[in-house]
Amino acid sequence: MQITILGSGVIGVTTAYYLAKLGHEVTVIDREEGPAPETSFANAGQVSPGYASPWAAPSIPLKAAKWLFQKHAPLILRLTTDPVQYRWLLQMLANCTDSRYKINKTRMVRVAEYSRDCLIELRKDTGIEYDQRSQGTLQLFREQYQLDGIGKDIEVLRQDGVPFEVLDRDGCVNVEPALAHAKDKFVGGLRLPNDETGDCFKFTNALAKIAEGLGVKFRFGVNIKSLLMSGGKISGVETSEGIVTAERYVVALGSYTPALIKALGLNAPIYPVKGYSITAPIVDESRAPVSTVLDESYKIAITRLGDRIRVGGMAEVSGFTDDLPAARRATLDLSVTDLFPGGDLKAATFWSGLRPMTPDSTPIIGGTRYDNLFINAGHGTLGWTMACGSGRLLADLISGNKADIRADDLGIARYN
């Protein structure tokens, strides 16, 4: 089939790759001049299925109220005049129950674990390189109450068969030796040995080249204006370079997905939640991480990417903003300096990206009420973690193949 994919981030490119492998004729359209220049450009770098947890958790309402008054809060709420923001926040609050948390986390871990397996298989098949490491991730707890409160997450990990280790201070230092100098800064950790790390931008660009070798065509610098309808189905995409037609269409536009499909009467409650990162060259190996360490207090991930340290995190609900506040940079600097002062922060680059978040933190993967329109968006903070699995899953659904994992609860129908 002829298939047009809108969006060339990591989700769009992985979808294109898997569709091409199944023999489809694929075209990818994006307004940017190359793959992954926005949200996929400088994310935290970890592929962490076991840490796939909803932001909408039972404890979040109370924590959010406290964070409003903290200088280095992991969640920042900047209210706008946009009613969409308020509706999204209310929907998120509705998911902050024990029952919804378990349902959402189970769905997220299902997609994320499958995606990690798909990534490993893709790497074996292609030999793709992207500063990859397979040395697990460590969630670091600075306070005892944080360590004491991981029971619900461990329950889900056991239920899903995800290996884990609860570590004391010495155990944390054993897997991340550079933490030896900071043993007084934490009480313990939760380690997931099967998690990985890697540069999402490098991966996406390398995979785009591999996809081109499979026949995928990329049309960059093309603005997407609207989806056209005829006879109850999508008949084309109106772009700055004319109308593009295909047999099937995939919307993989991250936070911009709702605006495109709204005219079709489709509701995708995806809202941009801004994240920040810095990337610094390593100048002291003995004080740099081996893999990824998640600083639970600040919700920040510190990741080793080759000869660089990537420090990323926080969640700012402020709409489509691209500013780089000094206060956010200060929080990133504080966390990494405290734990892994092996990078040259003076030479670091500062970045922000808009994570496409759904109220339940679960991505939208699947078809719509229009037979030839599909969506792959809303992965939030886990686009890199879920990319390969999401792309392969949707490719199977479009092709009429039996999916490897359950997909009926991932579609847009849960909102419409």
Curated annotation (Swiss-Prot):
GO terms for biological process: D-alanine catabolic process. This is D-amino acid dehydrogenase. Pathway: Amino-acid degradation; D-alanine degradation; NH(3) and pyruvate from D-alanine: step 1/1. GO terms for molecular function: D-amino-acid dehydrogenase activity. It comes from Brucella canis (strain ATCC 23365 / NCTC 10854 / RM-666). Belongs to the DadA oxidoreductase family. GO terms for cellular component: cytoplasm; plasma membrane. FAD binds at residues 3-17. The gene is dadA.
